[in-house]
């Protein structure tokens, strides 16, 4: 697929894709994903062509931006690493997020409270989000999916070849799609303007790791406070020696005592 020059992959974006290991695919290859394989490493890992990954990102963004009502786009992720990215994508683009377990009947059973009628569905992994793809096929909803080399492509209309198992790879792909959608909608004025949102915001964060970091920061703060030097003016264990015999109040006391006799 040939893209206009304005949609070309920039060196900065290529570095981001490589740094997040988007190009590292699985060892098994599904027959429909062979065109996306750049080469196979000696250890059996299939290297994905990031040029084709970028083309599919732009195509997916143009499809999403073409939907008049942003809430008619449903973004799903049953995979844990993609749930934070899906929620952030929905917050920035106005899509409808389905993070966590996909309730059967979301797209087909209108009696359920969570029933939805989206015009487009975007999923993180065709394997873990198989129920969403299956129900989309029943009601003729087009599907965009982040697919690894061994991912099934049945009922997937647009496949974005990438590493859909790493938390950095998943987060970066969702971030790039969101940025392209905002550029096409005109929220980001031109392609030379940097988006203020960093890709790190889309990365999965382990709750236990966050708590551990907070505890370490609190401990560091306590250590700093304990090690702070004490000023000379502050309270100490020493008391000043005062000669009460030489104080100005002694003669007055003696005079008062003498007058009583």
Curated annotation (Swiss-Prot):
One of its GO terms (cellular component) is cytosolic small ribosomal subunit. Residues 215-261 are annotated as: Disordered. It comes from the Eukaryota. Keywords: Acetylation, Cytoplasm, Ribonucleoprotein, Ribosomal protein. One of its GO terms (biological process) is ribosomal small subunit assembly. The modification N-acetylserine is found at residue 2. Residues 223-244 have a biased composition (Acidic residues). The keyword Protein biosynthesis does not apply. GO terms for molecular function: structural constituent of ribosome. Its main location: cytoplasm. It holds the Pfam family Ribosomal_S2. InterPro entries: Ribosomal_uS2, Ribosomal_uS2_C, Ribosomal_uS2_CS, Ribosomal_uS2_euk, Ribosomal_uS2_euk/arc, Ribosomal_uS2_flav_dom_sf. Transmembrane segments: none annotated. The keyword Cytoplasm applies. It is found in: Cytoplasm. Component of the small ribosomal subunit. Mature ribosomes consist of a small (40S) and a large (60S) subunit. The 40S subunit contains about 33 different proteins and 1 molecule of RNA (18S). The 60S subunit contains about 49 different proteins and 3 molecules of RNA (25S, 5.8S and 5S). Interacts with RPS21. NCBIfam families: uS2_euk_arch (TIGR01012). Belongs to the universal ribosomal protein uS2 family. Required for the assembly and/or stability of the 40S ribosomal subunit. Required for the processing of the 20S rRNA-precursor to mature 18S rRNA in a late step of the maturation of 40S ribosomal subunits. This is Small ribosomal subunit protein uS2. It comes from Scheffersomyces stipitis (strain ATCC 58785 / CBS 6054 / NBRC 10063 / NRRL Y-11545). The lineage of its organism: Eukaryota, Fungi, Dikarya, Ascomycota, Saccharomycotina. The gene is RPS0.
